[in-house]
């Protein structure tokens, strides 16, 4: 918060966390240089070394992003001025506005634990479906 000129509700823990913040509001940065390039972005949360600092190219500053979460060393936004991205994992990069990304390109599997657990997806008409797998390995989509 060393360059803060305005803004409110910001929390920074770690050397250079929110270091360029000038007028942004309601950001939380934990870790060395996390969200350090944010100048006008708002309502972002970043945890980890350099989390939320850059965009996916690794050099362009994430300075105006908003409503996003970055967890992991060098977790990055897809682009500057992005919105509503959830990015989890070391070196993971977002995949666009209103998206969630878990892991970088080296992650080869995503496991959902628990008996009966599933993934809920929404169709274009708004109907929600729970996707599960039965004991024979068949994929089942159930409207919920």
Explain the meaning of each model-derived region.
Residues 1-117:
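Glycine- and small/polar-enriched repetitive beta-structure motifs of secreted/surface proteins
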Residues 115-144:
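Extracellular "spike/adhesin" assembly and maturation modules
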């Amino acid at each position: 918060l060393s360059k803060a000129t305005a803004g409110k509700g910001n929390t920074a823990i770690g050397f250079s966390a929110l270091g360029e913040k000038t007028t942004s509001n309601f950001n939380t940065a934990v870790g060395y240089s996390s969200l350090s390039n944010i100048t006008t972005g708002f309502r972002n949360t970043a945890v980890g070394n350099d989390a939320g600092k850059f965009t996916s190219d690794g050099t362009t500053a994430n300075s105006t992003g908003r409503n996003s979460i970055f967890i992991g060393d060098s977790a990055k936004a897809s682009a500057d001025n992005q919105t509503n991205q959830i990015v989890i994992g070391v070196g993971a990069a977002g995949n666009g506005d209103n998206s969630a990304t878990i892991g970088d390109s080296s992650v080869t599997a995503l496991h959902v634990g628990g008996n009966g657990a599933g993934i809920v997806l929404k169709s274009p008409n708004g109907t929600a479906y729970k996707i599960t797998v039965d004991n024979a390995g068949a994929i089942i989509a159930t409207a919920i």
